Amino acid sequence: MCGDQSDHVLQHWTVDISIDEHEGLTRAKARLRWREKELVGVGLARLNPADRNVPEIGDELSVARALSDLGKRMLKVSTHDIEAVTHQPARLLY
């Protein structure tokens, strides 16, 4: 029966995000740990000298880029895992 609680599995994965800023460069790291593996995505944002300094925008942009990088890295892991199981080339789209 579809929706039966006996076939329902709930998992929680947590991404830890750290942000540091130095001399107009903001760097974010998005770290995911699961199944004894760890992936880290990195994102950078640089303050344009002509722009007003609004640190929150640099934080948002660097975090968005770090999460995007993490997603791409996760797809590479998934591709490798699929190929290991199927023994066929896999191509996953982002």
Swiss-Prot record:
Species in which this protein is naturally found: Mycobacterium tuberculosis (strain ATCC 25618 / H37Rv)
- Which signals induce this protein? A member of the dormancy regulon. Induced in response to reduced oxygen tension (hypoxia), low levels of nitric oxide (NO) and carbon monoxide (CO). It is hoped that this regulon will give insight into the latent, or dormant phase of infection. Induced in C57BL/6 mouse lungs 3 weeks after low dose aerosol infection with H37Rv bacteria.
Gene3D superfamilies per the UniProt record, alphabetical: Rv1738 (3.30.160.240)
- Name assigned to this protein: Uncharacterized protein Rv1738
GO CC annotations, alphabetized: cytosol; plasma membrane
**Which intervals of the chain form a coiled coil?**
none
Add the further remark from the entry.
Was identified as a high-confidence drug target.
Instruction: Tell me where on the tree of life, at the top rank, the source sits.
Output: Bacteria
* Family from the record: To M.tuberculosis Rv2632c.
